[in-house]
Each structure stands twice: as C-alpha cells, then as structure tokens.
Amino acid sequence: MTIDYSYITIIIPTLNEAENIERLIDSIFLLYPSISCLIVDDGSEDETQSIVLALKNKYSNLDLMDRSKEPVKGLCSSVVDGIQSCRTEYFIIIDGDGQHPPEFIQYCIKTLNLGADLSIGTREPYATRWTFSRIVISYSASILAKIRLLLCGVTIRDPMSGFFGGKTKFVQDILSQHKKSFTLGGYKILFDILKKVPKKCNLSGFYYPFGLRECGTSKLTIKIIIRYVLSFFR
C-alpha cells in the first residue's frame, strides 16, 4: 500500500547546487512519491534552476521559487520565504548538498505525526573527514546556541541543525510575529525560531548521520559567522 505524504512539503534552499540537486530530487520522490517538494533558489549562477525546471515535467509535485531578484540573500531568508509560501500541514527543511539523507525524512515525519510542533534532526558524531577547524567551529557554535536558548527556557540537543520540520501554521505564526528579530542574511534559521517558540511548545527529534558535501562548495563565510554571533543579542 502506498503511503500518503501529500500533507507534507519538503523545502530545499539552494545556491549553485547543479551537481547535487537532480540526484536529491530523484531520491525524494522515489522514497515519498506523493510528497510536495519546493526548491527555493537564491539566484544560482549554474544550471540549478534549469535542472529543476526540467524535472518539473517528471514530477508534478515539484515547484521552484526563484529568489534571484530578492534584495536580501541567504539561507535563512530562503527558508523563511519557503515556509511562508507553504500550503501543506507540515514542512520539512533539508539542505541541497546531500548532507541530509532523504531516507531519514521518514523519522522526521513520524515525530510530526505523533504531535510535535517542531521535529529537529540531531547530527550523529562528526564525519571522520571533517577538518579540525570545522569540528571546533561547529562544536563552539552549538555550545553558544545552547547557552543562549537556555535563557529562553529551551533545551535542545542540536540547535544548529539544518534538518528539521514542523507544523506549518505554528512556524508561520512565529515568523509573522517576530520576523524583525530574525537574521535573514544568516545561516541557521532554526536557532532564530527556537528563540521565539512558546513555553508549551512540543519539541521532538530524531538522529541522522550528517554526511559530507557530495559536490560543490560550502556557503559558510566569515560574514555569516559574524551575523550568527550578532544574532545572540536579538
């Protein structure tokens, strides 16, 4: 029996992911045929958008949002626009670089079906091929985020995760009420959302193996790190 996933939208923010995106989209629809998938592209200069548009002929539930003319760029603003445009009951965010395994989307769905307002993926031990500096940056950012969230009464294993899902209306309300306090040019939208969740929010999660980028280059820059640090004071 085919499982119905039509009440869920997978939102994938992209920027120059031509080497990854087709394989990722094919995997998603192979595993979850009835799910919706929205690619939110931040103005790719490669063939990312052309590939997605071609795949729309193959997958009727695939859509593309082109943000190339938007004044504010960045991963956070792409995710915010994707969530605000979502029309299904639930959404799930994954990266377009292959680091979030599509086969683990099912575990996010399971926790959402059990009543979670937000379901957050926790990265398993760091990939063995990560550089020492990358491990230090990631670990330090996570510790700082946990301390900041404790001030809001929120305890979570991996506040820097980019793999998470939630009730669409629940998160849309948070965005509409607190959007000015979000770092839209930043890199980690979940951290901003968690700072604004109500005290009785039902937070749940799942574990997943955090992969290495399959192709392309990381979007993490010094400017993004500075914006992240400044977000602690919002």
For the regions a language model picked out, list residue spans one by one.
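Hydrophobic helical membrane-anchoring modules
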Residues: 1-8, 23, 30, 151, ...
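Acceptor/aglycone-binding surface of glycosyltransferases and processive sugar-polymer synthases
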Residues: 67-85, 99-183, 187, 213-223
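A conserved acidic beta->alpha catalytic loop
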Residues: 41-50, 98
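Short loop->beta transition adjacent to catalytic acidic/histidine clusters or analogous donor-positioning motifs
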Residues: 5-9, 29-39, 47, 60-63
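Short aromatic/hydrophobic "clamp" motif used to bind/position activated sugar donors
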Residues: 91
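Acidic helix N-cap motif at the loop->helix transition within catalytic regions
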Residues: 19-23, 46-55
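A conserved hydrophobic helix/loop-capping motif in glycosyltransferases and polysaccharide synthases
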Residues: 8-17, 24
